[in-house]
Amino acid sequence: MDDQLRQSALDFHEFPVPGKIQVSPTKPLATQRDLALAYSPGVAAPCLEIEKDPLAAYKYTARGNLVAVISNGTAVLGLGNIGALAGKPVMEGKGVLFKKFAGIDVFDIEVDELDPDKFINVVAALEPTFGGINLEDIKAPECFYIEQKLRERMNIPVFHDDQHGTAIISTAAILNGLRVVEKNISDVRMVVSGAGAAAIACMNLLVALGMQKHNIVVCDSKGVIYKDREPNMAETKAAYAVEDDGKRTLDDVIDGADIFLGCSGPKVLSQEMVKKMARAPMILALANPEPEILPPLAKEVRSDAIICTGRSDYPNQVNNVLCFPFIFRGALDVGATAINEEMKLAAVHAIAELAHAEQSEVVASAYGDQDLSFGPEYIIPKPFDPRLIVKIAPAVAKAAMDSGVATRPIADFDAYIDKLSEFVYKTNLFMKPIFSLARKAPKRVVLTEGEEARVLHATQELITLGLAKPILIGRPSVIEMRIQKLGLQIKAGVDFEIVNNESDPRFKEYWSEYYQIMKRRGITQEQAQRAVIANTTVIGAIMVQRGEADAMICGTIGDYHEHFSVVKAVFGHRDGVHTAGAMNALLLPSGNTFIADTYVNDDPTPDQLAEIAVMAAETVRRFGIEPKVALLSHSNFGSSNCPSASKMRAALELIKARAPELMIDGEMHGDAALVESIRNDRMPDSPLKGSANILVMPNMEAARISYNLLRVSSSEGVTVGPVLMGVAKPVHVLTPIASVRRIVNMVALAVVEAQTQPL
């Protein structure tokens, strides 16, 4: 590596604190009672329960979500036998990947022991601590013996990722590659370069899926592995030794091969060898950092080749992070006693199937303009595909249950998948009541920026989840082109409707209706006609007004207030309401917080604040949450009589009269709103109990500042909204930073609102 990269890597590992992992408590330790519960004397209670029933350890300790990454440093990736201590940064890195991709906690354990039996004894003795063991960077052939003996001795999963992780991903790639070139696994011939742990595991898995052993030829550093080549050949190699036909080199056996599997070293495969391979050959050149052959060189001589490498700068990266976090997730969640062949094969099929699915928006944004539709350049998913956990973990868990190694079977797989989805989409639990209602009676929702990539991704999700009947406004040719480019599987006229914003036969009716609404607001017929042609928000609003759609989402492009001005002009306020307001939800580790008014009213009056607070409470109830409202101010329960504080006090009295059942108090400081003890010091008899979840600000400035500070300062927080309240129709104006998931969430909310709209 160059000097700049080397120094950057060293700085990354040293600052702000050395290393990449830490231990964080999951329980509060703020009081003497907390300490008494966490340690002596309270800790005796779970100890005694575990003594009576060892499975209780999964209930009272972190064991069920804790994996050991264990190595002796004899085969550290790309570095060789550098020793246990020198390999520690790699093991920490593995732990970070477990946590990042599957939420699994890891202790990295570096064992300074080269004797396999002694190493086995050390690892086996650690069984009470962990829910699973990930063996890492242990050289062959010792790794086979170590894994086998540990699997025999231990009643928790033991998984050597260097073997099985590579095998699972490679096998998934081969299955999909064969599908692309229309070849049968039982007929193809494969040549393998390398006979280490990964190569042997790959071959074993492929044979389990139907590849014929007699169609596999293996070459190691001494050439072709044939029977009786040498005395005392390792059993793992001997299992794939072929009859001696006089061929000794890779060049001798590559002629006519359908697949080349490289688990060896750089530049092993030449262009001349590639030329001799069969029609549409598959080349898996997995040596790192330099593969057996670089993809451009292979493509020069065989444009029909499908190529995989271990590198991220070429298509079809075979990366173990595609499987090991999710295999362990599934295994841990059912208390598996092993990771068996059935579980590995389940992972293979889940990974292979995901490559056929529509493109994920997260992956699309991470990989730019790459075409990620299933085909020669995309036969395995990308490592950052958020759907990996919800596809692989359940498949592995079910395989564990079906094969009899699960000690804690999952009773409700739908609920389990929902729980895994929360890891991908932090809003999933929050939105669950809304999604459930939306699915019962999906409504027609017009999305006014239908050509936007985020809107198209959202449309795919809406159809997949069954939440709405989307109507997209945009040019049909552009929408179709972008659907193809994004690798989506939705079809116009089948999954969604398109309204062509350049020419629709209804436009004369639309602009005529828009003119009737706007004619006494300074808009001429000509201006109304231009507005319909130029402004998709106007088109969408008129569609909802005419009953051609039930709800509308706009604002992913452009200024919020320009969109809102159209919404306000076309729809006006709902019955009994004289103002509109906007509210944003922040889903923080400390709880859900709603802030209003973030977008509509610059300086609301007491009457407007009262309406906004009552509407906010109504909206929060839709999420199954009891509203607790605090009116915020620099004044704390009458400490100031300035106009702003007086306004909040006046709003409180209006709210009490209009919604006496509402739990609300004010005016108060922000800390008093969120911390009951602080509030009680100043106002012991406050009707507001616990932490407020709706914060009504004195003006838009305070609301927007507070919202953005909380949004940015909480790295774990996610947002929903803005939710538009008080408009006569179910309409929400989003902002240009809206993610795909936020669009989906707001469409679902609009559907639920439309379900309760009077006809």
Label each residue range with its predicted role:
Residues D2, D161-D162, L178-N184, A285-A393, ...:
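Adenosine-phosphate binding glycine-rich loop
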Residues L66-G78, G83, A167-T171, V181-V207:
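Glycine-rich adenosine-cofactor-binding loop
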Residues L85, D137-N184, T407-I410, I417-L759:
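Anion-binding alpha/beta catalytic cores of soluble intermediary-metabolism enzymes, centered on
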Residues S193, L209-K237:
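NAD(P)-binding Rossmann-fold cofactor-contacting core
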Residues E127, I185, V253-I254, V274-M277, ...:
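A short, aliphatic-rich alpha-helical micro-motif
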Residues E235-A305, R311-D313:
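Rossmann-like adenosine-cofactor binding region
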Residues M1-V158, A399, A406, K432-L456, ...:
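N-terminal ligand-binding/catalytic initiation module
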